[in-house]
Design a protein with these regions (language model features):
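Generic structural signal for residues positioned in beta-strands
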Residues: 198, 230, 318-320
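Short, solvent-exposed coil/turn linker segments
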Residues: 142-145, 235-239, 252, 347-363
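Acidic, glycine-rich loop-and-strand cores that form catalytic or ligand-binding grooves
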Residues: 269-296, 317
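NUDIX/MutT-family hydrolases
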Residues: 314-319, 325, 329-383
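Active-site-adjacent beta-strand/loop module that shapes the phosphate/pyrophosphate-binding cleft
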Residues: 289-329
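Intrinsic-disorder/low-complexity loop/linker signature
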Residues: 133, 175, 208, 297, ...
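Conserved Nudix-box catalytic region and its N-terminal flanking loop in Nudix hydrolases
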Residues: 200, 207-281
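Alpha-helical and coiled-coil interaction segments, frequently adjacent to or embedded
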Residues: 2-228, 363-390
Length: 390
């Protein structure tokens, strides 16, 4: 990394609500430039597919790993994060509270001053360790969504304020005390690394040509990466309910993916019929159809990597789902144009964007505002298009 950790300093006076919201808007409006500025702080770290998505070498397999070969482990003992957004190091990113003093957390400030439509502190899975280069294994424990947001979005806010103060020039860790205490963003046990399962959906036509889906995330509706393109579906890895039994039963990337396919592509609700807090997947027709397609080989699902966004610390498990065209057309004949988080991108009246070198360069080469993980996933899928589409 480019600088040593910053020494503690006295916090400036608390920002007023308008000034604080202005920096938050800057994070969305200048996200790509801020991602680049954040990535430059970690110039010695590996990147995913030449993008700004940070990784460790063991997170990048040589080729696609069948989802069935990824083992998920569970730890009931979660280490206390060494870095969080509590205490004096975070005071400078917390605005003044109407009740006096500062807000006590970043999410409390968001809820009161800049709440998006979707902003809930749900039970989530926190990633503790990962390897995808040998026997693939991901180990999780219990956490909550705000545990990740409080740090990730606070360090993004801190960097945006410093970047604005420099006139859009380089920033250094010496002026970023909250980020400086973090250390290596890929050291998962030092923070609450709540993960997203981010999926590139490919429709494979006879002959091998493919197309993909793209989502535009509405900044009025989502807290993370509003105003950007993203592959779809993508969603936080979490159980369907907070019931203790559901937490263990839903520790499944596939179950999470099927829910996201339903919600993002078909506009399905996030609330599911449950008994005892658990969803009976075997009684859900859509789940049965998707699972049958996997078993028949007309849907192939692979994990191709894992990475960390340098700006917000968002941590994404990168997957690819390749559907035979006939299966895709049958399962998603009700493909929506809009959903709870934004809209499905269309070109020339079609949601099917050709999976070509030109399209990958457009959406993963800096020409369009694409979320960092989505850009990395597009590039990885293009690199691995032979085994993925063969």
């Amino acid at each position: 990394m480019s600088d040593q950790a910053a020494a503690p300093r006295t916090a400036p006076p608390a920002a007023d609500a308008d000034s604080w919201r202005r920096i938050r808007r800057m994070v969305n409006e200048h996200r790509q430039a801020l991602v680049v500025a954040a990535a430059q702080l970690y110039d010695g770290m590996p990147r995913v597919a030449g993008t700004d998505l940070l990784c460790w070498p063991e997170w990048q397999p040589a080729g696609p790993v069948d989802l069935a070969d990824v083992t998920l482990g569970w730890s009931s003992r979660a280490p206390v994060p060494g870095a969080d957004a509590a205490g004096p190091a975070a005071a400078h990113v917390l605005p003044a509270s109407p009740a006096g003093g500062r807000f006590t957390s970043y999410t409390a400030a968001v809820a009161a001053l800049d709440r998006p439509a979707l902003f809930e502190n749900r039970i989530c899975y926190r990633l503790l360790s990962a390897t995808l280069t040998g026997p693939a294994r991901l180990t999780f424990t219990r956490s909550r969504y705000f545990d990740a947001v409080n740090l990730g979005h606070a360090v993004a806010h801190e960097l945006a304020a410093a970047w604005a103060g420099s006139g859009g020039g380089p920033v250094s860790l010496a002026g970023l005390p909250l980020r400086a205490q973090l250390g290596d963003p890929c050291e998962l046990r030092r923070r609450c690394a709540v993960t997203a399962v981010t999926t590139l959906t490919l429709r494979r036509a006879p002959g091998g040509r493919a197309s993909f889906l793209l989502h535009w995330r509405d900044p009025a509706r989502v807290h993370h990466a509003g105003g950007q393109y993203q592959v779809m579906p993508a969603g936080i890895f979490q159980p369907v309910t907070a019931a203790p039994a559901a937490r263990r039963r839903d520790l499944s990337l596939w179950q999470c993916m099927t829910r996201e396919f339903s919600e993002e592509l078909l506009g399905g609700p996030e609330e599911y019929p449950t008994r005892g807090g658990m969803l009976d997947y075997g009684q859900w027709p859509f789940y049965r159809e998707l699972t049958a397609a996997r078993q028949a080989g007309t849907l192939r699902v692979s994990c191709v990597g894992l990475g960390v966004d340098p700006l917000t610390l968002a941590t994404d498990i990168l997957t690819v789902a390749v559907f035979d065209a006939a299966v895709f057309d049958r399962l998603f004949r009700g493909l929506v144009t809009r959903n709870a988080e934004g809209r499905v991108v269309t070109e020339n009246g079609s949601a099917a964007i050709p999976f070509t070198a030109e399209a990958v360069h457009r959406f993963a080469g800096g020409r369009e505002p694409t979320q960092t993980a989505g850009a990395a996933l597009l590039r990885l899928a293009w690199q691995h298009r032979g085994p993925l589409l063969g």
